[in-house]
Each structure stands twice: as structure tokens, then as C-alpha cells.
């Protein structure tokens, strides 16, 4: 009986992981634990066969975010294996972000069998409930143990996962009760592997193609209010689709712009290509300067709203139609509640629009006068920024947002951490992110998992530049404990403002200095060179943009993880930025 259970645990683990690989899993993160041993051992064997990449992480929280970074950068499903108990609870922050950013990730969590539940058994908790509020599906193998799960039950579970990911991507929790024995002898492992390779490895399985059918009636209801002969603006927020669909997304956006002639405001993480006609540079500053004089009555909004107070005010006060087009995201996405929402994506919307209006495929409108005016406004602001921001300036956060896209090679990816970096880049980067893949996890917009996410992205797309504040970075320092993270071609631009500088901008005028520091800034006196040395990560401190350029070139050349620290004076930052904004708005 003992031999039978250990062999069935191992065989079912092999079958499950093999099927998940067949629906797109290429990368797997395994965390330590005994209860998950059959899954981990099976993953190791499939890795030996060259079927899946495996990386380990001793911290489940980091593992979840690492897997999410891989999913975002690759466009493929990623997978995390954990043991039971509190290990599962540590997956929640990554599950929250995966839910809100619509990224496919599977959490395989080992559990105790039903007979050990609700009786005080060690390390036995209600883990099947921990992720239920944010996961697309919560599934389970046989509650009495994996060894009692039938082959067809495993296949059905994988088909459910595949259908869910195809229609509405996000996190999926598959809880797997496993009874002892958890390990397997060398002889039994050899015998089970022979059976698996002979019968199951090359077996063909049928997975249904799921086509998302659009709602023509809903499209007609929404689009009838559009008048393409009148002025409008296309607003492109953070991209929530798969990176694998970016090309078709941009082709549809290009066609939409051609048939309207409208200007385009693109978020730094919109995924929009830099050569799109009609792009308005410095559009947030243009909005701030011309908030009451932009004359149009229709907006096409793609994806969630950018993190911009000026844009939010503009949308709230906008008197006209707003259409919000979403990419495989069926929840409400409009916090100001003024738009008609269309769930079926830009490609579908553009195709139906062309069909409905019988637009000639070769039809291409000239840029409308308003577009030309807004583009010219953006270029004028660009000249002011060029005059005020030079390589001789003392480094500030807003200057980094403007200069770094020009210093980092145009084709190399960038990740922006949450909090102040994404806001500064929205305002000052001058569309400098649009020549490359640019990532920022705007689903829940937390600072959680910053380093682990970056390491995950760098496994797929590198050399990667992570731009992060000091608190966001130190919050996830366990990311360095992910297997071979220090060997990634990853450059970390560490903005050291000795605390959460975004709170300086929000609360400085209303709090005493000691209150501000204790309650919001929370500065940490960290010896950064020693910290980097402890993790065997290369480190440099730079004081000006000339040295920063040299350091960035050096970081790419050594092809390993590097920390480049720049020190920011928050007082100087606020003073200089306010003076610059006054000059721009008053020009």
C-alpha cells in the first residue's frame, strides 16, 4: 500500500505538470517544503527532459511576484509550487496584482488530506480559502489525496484552467491534498518514469480553442454616438493585454488613428509604438496648461486610466462621449463612471467600426487641426525641458524621468516601480518608453514585489533597467534569494531619497518635519554598498548624469545584476520642479 501511494503521488504529479506544460507553462518556481515533495520531484524530472524551466525561491511571497514578472514579460502561463500552511498565505499579494493586471499565473499548493482537516493536525489550515477572493478559479484534486485522483479528473482540471486563461486571464489556485508517503524510492521513481514516458509523455490531448465572441448589439449601441467627422482624442492607458498581442493591438490603434486623424495621449506603459502618427509628447503637461481650452466632445479610452490627477480632472469635467475599450477584462474600469465600456478589445472594436461605416481600407485622414495644435504644444514644452535639463544638472527624480530614456538604449526594456517613478515618467519622459517594452504593475499599484518582479522580467527580456525608490526596493530585498537572481542582466537604478518621497509632495505643507518622517517617510539608514556586497551584487554610486551614462553602459557590459544609486535631495527636488512647472504652464 505504501509503495502504491508514493508511486501514484509521483505519477499524478508528472501527469498534472505535463498537461500544464502542454497548455503553455514554460517556467516554474518551486518553494521549499515537504508536503509538496511529489510535485517538486516531478518538476525536476520534467526539467531534465527539457520540458520546463525551474527556478527556486525560499520566500513564497517573492516566488509569486517572480512568477508574475515572468508571465508579464513572456505572455505565457507561469506556475508556482508551494507547501502547505502559511506558505500559501504569502502568495496573496502577488495574486492580488495578477488579478488586477490580468496576468495568467497558477498556484499549485500542496495540502493535507481531508482526514487531517479540522482536527488540530500540525500545519493544517483552511488554505483553500486564502486566495479565493482574488483568483479566477479555486480548484482541487481529490480531497482524500492526490493518489485517489483519477487521470480524467486531472485532465478536466487542466481544461478548466486553459479555458479560464483563454477568456479572462488571471490567477488560478489549484490546491492539492497529498497523503504520505511524500517521497519516493529510487527504484519506484525509475519504474514510474518508465511508465510515464511510455504511455503519457507523448500522448496527444485535445484542448478546445476558445473564441471570444463579441457583442455586435453592444458595439452598435456604443458606437452610434461616435462621429468620426468631429474632433476627438485617443487616450491609451496601461496595457493589460498579453505582450504576445501587442503587435495586433498596435496595428488596430494605427488603423483607428488613420480613420479619425485624432491625437493620441499614450501612457508610459501603454505598449504603444513610438512611430505612431498623432502621438502628443508631454501630453500631461499640455493638459495641465490647456485644461479649459481643448475643444472636443468625444474620447476613445483604451485600458485603465493613467495615474494622473490632471487627466482625471479633465475626464471628470469632460462634456461629451467617452468610450472605454478593454482587453479581456470584464470588470468595471472607470472610476469616474462616465464612459460606455466595451469588453472585447481594440482589434475587435476597430474591425467592427470599419465594417459598420464601410470605410475603405486605404482611407487615411489627415491629422485634424486640434491634433496639430496639441502636438505643437507638446514640442514647445519639449524645448523648455531640453533647455532646463542638461547633463550638468544635479540629479533629481523628474530629471531622471526625462534623461534616463535617452541614456538607456532605445530597444532595451525598462520597469518602473510603483509610487513616484511612474508618476514622474508619465509627466517628464517625453514618450521615451515607447521605443521599447516598458513594464509597471498598475493593477493594484503597490510597491510589493518590486525586485522579484524585475528578476522575473529579466529572465525573459534583458538587459532590463529597474527604476525604483529606496523603500520599494528594500521592501522586497528577499528577491535576491531567488535562484541565480544576481546573475541576471538587470540594472537597478536606485533612487535614494531616504524614504517615501511621494509623501513629501502630498503632506509636507500640513505636517511638522518629525511627524512627516515618522508617520510617512520612514527613512532607513542603510549602508547600501555593504548590503550589495552581502548579496554579491555589483554596486556604484553616481552624482551626475555624465557619470550615470558611464555607469549604465558599464552595467550592460558586465551582464550581471547591478545597483546604481543616485542620491536625491527632496527639498531641492520640490523647489526645482515647481519652478519648472510654473515656467511651462506660464509659457
Swiss-Prot record:
Keyword hit for Flavoprotein: no
Keywords in alphabetical order: Magnesium, Manganese, Metal-binding, Thiamine pyrophosphate, Transferase
Lineage, opening ranks: Bacteria, Bacillati, Cyanobacteriota, Cyanophyceae, Synechococcales
Binding partners and assembly: Homodimer.
Job description of the protein: Catalyzes the thiamine diphosphate-dependent decarboxylation of 2-oxoglutarate and the subsequent addition of the resulting succinic semialdehyde-thiamine pyrophosphate anion to isochorismate to yield 2-succinyl-5-enolpyruvyl-6-hydroxy-3-cyclohexene-1-carboxylate (SEPHCHC).
Cofactor: Mg(2+); Mn(2+); thiamine diphosphate
Catalytic activity line of the entry: isochorismate + 2-oxoglutarate + H(+) = 5-enolpyruvoyl-6-hydroxy-2-succinyl-cyclohex-3-ene-1-carboxylate + CO2
Co-factor binding comment: Binds 1 thiamine pyrophosphate per subunit.
Name of the protein this chain belongs to: 2-succinyl-5-enolpyruvyl-6-hydroxy-3-cyclohexene-1-carboxylate synthase
Enzyme Commission number(s) from the entry: 2.2.1.9
Family statement drawn from the similarity comment of this UniProt entry: Belongs to the TPP enzyme family. MenD subfamily.
Annotated GO MF terms: 2-succinyl-5-enolpyruvyl-6-hydroxy-3-cyclohexene-1-carboxylic-acid synthase activity; magnesium ion binding; manganese ion binding; thiamine pyrophosphate binding
Gene name linked to the record: menD
Gene3D superfamilies: 3.40.50.970, TPP-binding domain
GO biological process, one term: phylloquinone biosynthetic process
Pathway: Quinol/quinone metabolism; 1,4-dihydroxy-2-naphthoate biosynthesis; 1,4-dihydroxy-2-naphthoate from chorismate: step 2/7; Cofactor biosynthesis; phylloquinone biosynthesis
